[in-house]
Amino acid sequence: MMKKLFLSAYALSFLISVFAQDVVNHAVARDFTVNQALVTLMSGDKKCYNTSSVSSIDLDHHSDKVTVTTTSGGSDVFNGSVYSIAFSKRVNTENAVQITEAKGWLESAYVLFADFIGATSYHVYVKGGQYSDFTQIDNQLIRSYGTHNRADAMGLKAGDYAMKVVPVVDETEINEAATIVDNLTVKSFNRDGYAHYNASSGIGAYTNDGTLKNGARIIYVSKANAKTVSLEMQVDNKGKMETRTGIQNIIQAYEKGVETRPLVVRVIGLLKKADMDELGSSAIGLQVKGKGQNMNLTIEGVGSDATFHGFGVLVRACKYVELRNFGVMMHEEDGISFDTDNEHVWGHHLDIFYGKNKGGDKAKGDGSFDVKGTLYCTVSDNHFWDSGKCNLNSNGDEVDFVTYRHNWYDHSDSRHPRVRKSKHLHVYNNYFDGNSKYGVGATTGSCIFVEKNYYRNCKYPMLISKQGSDIHNGVGSAADTKGTFSSEDGGIIKAFDNYMTGQKSFEPYIAGDATYSKHFDAYVVENRNEQLPSEVVTLQGGTGYNNFDTASDFYSYSPDAAADVPAVVTGHYGAGRCNHGDFQYTFDNATEDANYDVILDLSNKLEAYASSLVKIYCLDEYSDEQPGGDEPTPELGGDDPDPQSQDSVVIVTFNGSSSNAMFTAAENYGDGKITYDGTYYKKGEKLDSKGSVVFTPQKDYNMVLVLATVKPGRDVKINGEKTTVSGAENAEGAYYELLPISVTADTEYKITKGSAEAILMLIKLTPKE
């Protein structure tokens, strides 16, 4: 008698799983140098097969069985365990990552590079300075901008560096396709000024050599995570820790007065008001508030496009706080406000634009960068774009020991700075560039040393309240003699070695003169260490100069010559963000030097500003429109990928070396000193009997050559033939730009001396349509 055996569905499936196991004997290791089939299992494991060794892959739709048959006759069988099948073309390592631009900046270096076909991400390494070997930078520092990628290495001490870009496919580095660029000169931030005077350590989270302080923490903030980023913060003096979420909420933990661990907040891309978790100050925006402790906090932008739009930054009751390398647009009131009970604070390399138009004297916003209730402060290397009221220094509160240096007052109107009460105020090496109202304003018993600044078409370079140019020497109508500063008492100015051109009026003190011994805008000295006589006092208030700048304990500093200030401030290492930021606007000096109204075109562009950032490689959720990361799916045994795209503009410079690996320059450099497209370039390739540049483009381009006018050459030879195209000279920039010359893919070009010696400063290749 036959017995029947009944099995449950569960038991049956168990037996099937036991007796129908996968049979896998022919899979190979992942190899990016050959075409492969990728079989991904439900478990997440991947089995790889070289397509040249596979004759077929068969799928049974009834049982979900997959069979991989090899050309040698063997087969691997997967019994319902396959999740997906994909095909991966080999990576063409004959074409390495194309670096289109690489430069050192201030305590950082960056590299721009084209997409590498097949790469899902990149690893970037830096070597030099504190890094004896190539050291990987944080993945958050690698971003896509659609037409190109960018990576920034940050926290570098001064020195020469190299960077290496390695494409990554499926979390595996393709080292054969890596590209290295070297000779990237990194300089230190200039730390001269009162912020660092008698400071016990570096201002912010960095030491004075540009490296991070011991134990420093870093958080990265973008629109993708400004509300969700979290960090553990100390909240009482017993060591209690609290996890705070959202960037404003994290910073608010400092109000407990106990958190002092160094922290760097690195801002990536554009942050709008709606992106923030909250804002601690309804009037200003992001509030950085302590309780008088050394906070060791730096807020800095990554690259050239970090921007706060719709809000600014308020710093209150803080010590050792640093703001650097970001832009502020369309803020509610002040752009930056150092306000109340701050010490040793520093704001530098910021781009500050219009605020919200609230009419009247707030049509361009309120203060761009105001300092109130603060001691030991430096405001340096900032770019002010047509600001209405730049730098209020005291609103009647106690402000002292403040330095303003290397700022670019670009068509801004007034308050550069406007000073009350401060007895130790140093203003030097600033570029006053087309200012419609006045430069430095001294009131209420203040003492200001104004040194080695460059004034171009600044209406009144210096004013003292109720005397001199401020009231037309007391002569004229009531309007002429009213004054600028609400009838406040005067402050006194010592001036040394300033350069002025195009001003309406500047009246220096003249001893014994009936008018100019009373009505003067500044006391001008011939020697920096000359002291002002005690009898020199302001007409209203009777304030004399305290000669603070000649005291033995005055801080050490190294000023630039006044004549060099425009080139320094507008140069590559100059004012504003890295690369002068991602927003550019050219002022028409003929109309804007004297205009103090809002420029509607500029205002509209700022309102409409949008970031070109597409993707942060470690944050897939950054954008809804980021490039896909799927693997290519060619036919079995398909062709190799096309050579990598060179669709972006290629720019190469020769400041001591070629900035692009495509170009080989003879080591024959000379000083050209040009300003091209807003960037200052010092050196170029000297085309004499020794100089040459050789390159082979991988696609067709239109080539523009830029020569320095310091040498007579206005043409070159290309492969032995003299160029015949004409060009245009830019006297202000000191360069001669040839009209475009066509170059063809896969052809070697050698550029040498033409009719006369020349200095080739820059080559720009624009892809042909």
Q: Which ranges hold each PLM region?
A:
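Right-handed parallel beta-helix
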Residues: 295-305, 319-330, 342-358, 367-368, ...
